[in-house]
């Protein structure tokens, strides 16, 4: 009465961090098709404002992507960029910058295989350096 199960090995470096959880990236496909999508995309918040924009190649994020802060009632951050950086084969790579909703720089540094590498610089909401850290 045993249960046979197969174990699948997953390279954690290829997982995408969203919040405090990691997910396996999925291929982005044409609606109603099994063909992976290649081309530019723009995603929108329910308000109609841009949420993210960037290119896909063979179903994976590939190229410079920009993310915007979600608009708020007071409209202090409408249209303000939240982060911008490079994807290669669906994984963050190279230099990335993040901003506070007020438009000041929050942090910047490099990624390799979805992991922070090298020197990262962190800023307060006034744009002043508060910490540097090596990864």
Predicted feature locations:
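Glycine/tyrosine- and acidic-biased, solvent-exposed loop/turn segments at the edges of beta-strands
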Residues: 2-135
């Amino acid at each position: 009465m045993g249960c046979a199960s197969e174990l699948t090995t997953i390279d954690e470096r290829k997982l995408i961090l969203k919040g405090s959880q990691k997910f396996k990236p999925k291929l982005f496909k044409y609606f109603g098709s099994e063909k992976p999508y290649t081309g530019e995309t723009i995603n929108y918040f329910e308000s109609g404002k841009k949420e993210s924009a960037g290119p896909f190649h063979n179903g994976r994020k590939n190229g410079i992507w920009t993310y915007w802060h979600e608009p708020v009632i007071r409209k202090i951050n409408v249209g303000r960029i939240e982060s911008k950086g490079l994807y290669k084969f669906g994984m963050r790579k190279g230099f990335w910058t993040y901003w506070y909703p007020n438009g000041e720089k929050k942090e910047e540094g490099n990624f390799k295989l979805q992991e922070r590498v090298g020197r990262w610089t962190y800023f307060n909401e006034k744009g002043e350096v508060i910490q540097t850290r090596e990864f």
